[in-house]
C-alpha cells in the first residue's frame, strides 16, 4: 500500500500501511516557471530544518534547474549549501538578462515601445489576479471585468480593450521600419519568443553576481540518482536525462534510441526540461528535439518510485486546486482564455494525475503544494519571488507538523492569510512607488500597508504561541517593505511601521 501524507486535497484516498519499509528518499521537484521560487522555501525547510537529504531527485522544467544544482551534493551540509545556491539563483532571475534572451525577431524590435510591450506581457501578463477590490473589480484586470459586473462596468471594460488595441496598433506603426527585418528573422527563429541561452551560459560559466555554474563531475559521482523530465517532439514520448547525461525512456532506466551516441550535456538536459513550448525553442539532443517535460509529466513521482524510492517528497509549484477566477471569459481576449485553460487548468489536472500514479506498496508520498497563487509563470518581481519562497518554507512546516489536527488546520489557514496579506502589502507598496509620496492618496495607501503589516505580525505571533515553526528573520515581513525593482522613493518613511 501507499501512504499519503500532506495536503493533496483532490488526490484519491489510499489505504495506510503502518510500517513503510526503510529505503531511499526522493525529492520530486515540479515545473512552474518562476513559481518554482516556492520550491526553494520547501527545500530550505526539508534540508535545513528537518535534516532530510535525498538519494534520488526527479524534476521537470524549473524544478530541473534546481535539481541540477542540488544534485552536486552528497552530504547534508553539502545539500544545505546547494539549497542556498538555488535561492541565490532564483533571486538572480530578477536580472532578466541572466535568464532570458530575446529571439532574433524580438531582438529586431529592441528599443521600440512594441518590443518592450511584448516582453512585459510575457513577464508580467501571467501574474495571478489580486482579490476583488472594495468596488468589486479585479485589481489590475480592468480589461476583463468580473462575470458579475453590471452594464456600466462592461462598457468600461470594452472601452479599455479598444484603447489597448489602438495602443498596440500605434506601437506596431511606430516600429514599422523594423518590420521587414522582423519578418526575415521570423523565418528562422519564429518558433518562440524568448530563449534560455543566458541561463545556459550562466549554468556553465556563472555570472559573477547571480547564477552560479554547475560542475557535471560532481553530479556524476555515485550516491545520487538524477532524472530530468523532457518531452521528445519527434518520438512524442516522455524521456529523462540522467546524472551522467544518458537519455532514458519513461521507465527512468531503459536507454532511449540515440543514447548509444554518448551522454548529452547536463546543462542542455536541464534547459530542455525548462523549455516551455512556444515561449522557448526546442533543444536538440541526440536524435530528437526536446521541450519541457511538463507537457507530459509535471510531477515525476512515478520515476522516483521506479528508481527505488520508498519515501517521496513531491514539491509542487502550481496550486492543485485553482481559485475561482471571476473574470468574464465570454468577453475576454484569447490570451486570457488560453492562459486559463491550458496554462492553469490543464497544468493543475496533469499534476493531480501525476500525484495519483500507482505506486508500489510501502512507498510514502508527501505532497507539499501551494494553495495561494503568488507569482506569474515568468514573473521576476523580487518581492513576489521572496514572498513565494517564504510561503514554501511555511507550507512545508505545516505539512510535516505533528500534533492536534484542528490546531494544524488553523495554522494552515494562518499561513495562507500571511501570504495573502504580504502580497496585498506588496501591491499597495507598488502603487506608492509609482505615485510617489507627494501624491494625495499616499498617506491613505501607507495606512493600508501598515494594516497589512500588523495583520502579518499578529498571524506570526499566533503561530509561534501555538508552537509552530517560523523562519529566521520573519520580523522583516512587518517591520520593512517588501522588495521592489526600484529603491524606496525619497519622502517615504524608512519603515512602514515608523
Where are these regions (language model features)?
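Extreme N-terminal basic, low-complexity initiation segments
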Residues: 1-5
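Catalytic DNA-binding helix-loop module of base-excision-repair DNA glycosylases/AP lyases
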Residues: 66
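Patatin-like phospholipase
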Residues: 8-60, 69-498
